């Protein structure tokens, strides 16, 4: 498969950064460059970072910029090839055989209508129309990672009843990892890699203003300061960008309904903290945190 030297409408990392911004995703220069190179070189893009920094949103935005459908494969412990590739619709196959009665031996039960496509097979069959997102690959086991490595080597699978299916062009593949475990070095070598950090305060404020409609700049700045303080606390789950956006929206909504700003932030704390122990830990500290954030 030929390497892509150009991408329609995206001639540089800066052009991709601008296109992502138009799709309401604020990428920095490092991320837009990594994504551009992955697309141009025809290599998978591996995005690592803490939960909530925008890895999955980046994949969605890239698919939107390319005008393609996002095929999301959510990984979990115990995921296997059947969940990622395909299954046969056994009940429909049996129904088709029963309906034919004595002629059942002439029924082809391996036609497309009986094939249940999973994301990886769909990507192979329609690579020009899709972006494959393999989300949270670190949650899968080493066996699935080995299977994935083989898939990424030649973008081909074999269905015993149908033969080999190979992508006619190199698909766009994005992998994400929260780094709960180390990925195999061979998998990393096949990818263009980028680590997504928590955004700098000014950039996080711009993200909130872009994604949270109706939020005033003062409220956005207060959220950024308060969330930054929360991230320095020993919490089970530190708030990510999505929680910051939702907190800004929730506090603004309560303020519009008559709550004063500090109370609006205090009452909507469950939007930004999603763990009981974290709420208990922060409760006696929230007033000082809000005061420090100049709420």
Placement of each model-derived feature along the sequence:
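C-terminal regulatory/interaction module of P-loop NTP-utilizing enzymes
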Residues: 1-295
């Amino acid at each position: 498969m030929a390497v892509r030297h150009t991408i329609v409408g995206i001639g540089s990392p800066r052009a991709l950064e601008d296109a992502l911004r138009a799709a309401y995703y604020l990428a920095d220069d490092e991320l837009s460059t990594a994504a551009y190179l992955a697309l141009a070189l025809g290599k998978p893009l591996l995005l690592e970072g803490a939960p909530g920094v925008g890895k999955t949103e980046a994949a969605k935005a890239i698919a939107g910029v390319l005008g393609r459908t996002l095929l999301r494969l959510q990984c979990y412990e115990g995921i296997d090839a059947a969940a990622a590739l395909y299954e046969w619709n056994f009940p429909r196959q049996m129904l088709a055989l029963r309906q034919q009665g004595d002629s059942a031996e002439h029924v082809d039960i391996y036609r497309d209508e009986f094939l249940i496509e999973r994301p990886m097979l769909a990507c192979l069959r329609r690579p020009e129309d899709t972006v494959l997102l393999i989300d949270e690959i670190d949650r899968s086991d080493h066996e699935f990672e080995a299977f994935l490595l083989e898939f990424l080597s030649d973008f081909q699978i074999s269905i015993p009843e149908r033969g080999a299916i190979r992508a006619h062009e190199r698909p766009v593949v994005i992998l994400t990892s929260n780094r709960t475990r180390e990925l195999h070095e061979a998998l990393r070598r096949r990818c263009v890699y980028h680590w997504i950090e928590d955004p700098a305060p000014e950039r996080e404020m711009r993200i909130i203003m872009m994604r949270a409609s109706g939020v005033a700049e003062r409220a956005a700045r207060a959220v950024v300061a308060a969330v930054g303080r929360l991230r320095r606390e020993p919490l089970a789950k530190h708030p990510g960008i999505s929680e910051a956006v939702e907190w800004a929206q929730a506090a603004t909504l309560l303020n519009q309904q008559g709550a004063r700003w500090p109370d609006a932030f205090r009452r909507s704390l469950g939007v930004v903290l999603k763990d009981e122990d974290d709420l208990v830990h922060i409760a006696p500290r929230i007033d000082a945190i809000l005061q420090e954030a100049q709420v």
